[in-house]
UniProtKB/Swiss-Prot annotation:
Protein name from the UniProt record: Phosphoribosyl-AMP cyclohydrolase
Biological process per Gene Ontology, one example term: L-histidine biosynthetic process
Database matches in InterPro entries: PRA-CH, PRib_AMP_CycHydrolase_dom, PRib_AMP_CycHydrolase_sf
Cofactor notes: Binds 1 Mg(2+) ion per subunit. Binds 1 zinc ion per subunit.
NCBIfam families to which the protein is assigned, alphabetical: PRK00051.1
Cofactor(s) needed: Mg(2+); Zn(2+)
Keyword Repressor among UniProt keywords: no
């Protein structure tokens, strides 16, 4: 992607994602209705493109070094309602309608534990 000015990046209308040195940007995934944070993942240009084209969240697996469609195996897809872009265009929030649990453990959200006095406590309700 071509470089744009800081002013255009921060206040303009040109979408020019600022990927890190590994070609990734952070994606925070929130439930469209409750705004609960469901997960955090990474997107490369291909994942961002696939998400925009299909309306289903796609991410880049750093461990497997491959593109993956969330819910491709489990069926627990994330239908993207809106993509919010931060001021630096190096992170996005995906507002989604989940088709099931967001976490691979089966939990509704990947954030189901709280750090309390040095130990993790389950906070699922």
């Amino acid at each position: 992607m071509s470089e744009i000015s800081a002013e255009e990046r921060e206040s303009g209308t040109v979408f020019a994602p600022k990927f890190d040195s590994d070609g990734l940007l952070t994606a925070v995934v929130q439930h469209v209705d409750t705004r609960e944070v469901l997960m955090v993942a990474f997107m490369n240009a291909d994942a961002l493109d696939a998400t925009r084209k299909t309306g289903i969240a796609h991410f880049f697996s750093r461990s497997r070094q491959t593109l993956w469609k969330k819910g491709g195996t489990s069926g627990n897809t994330l239908a993207v309602s809106q993509v919010l872009v931060d001021c630096d265009q190096d992170a996005v929030i995906l507002l989604v309608e989940p088709a099931g649990p967001a976490c691979h453990t089966g939990a509704r959200t990947c954030f189901y534990r709280e750090l309390d006095c040095g130990a993790l406590q389950d906070v699922r309700t």
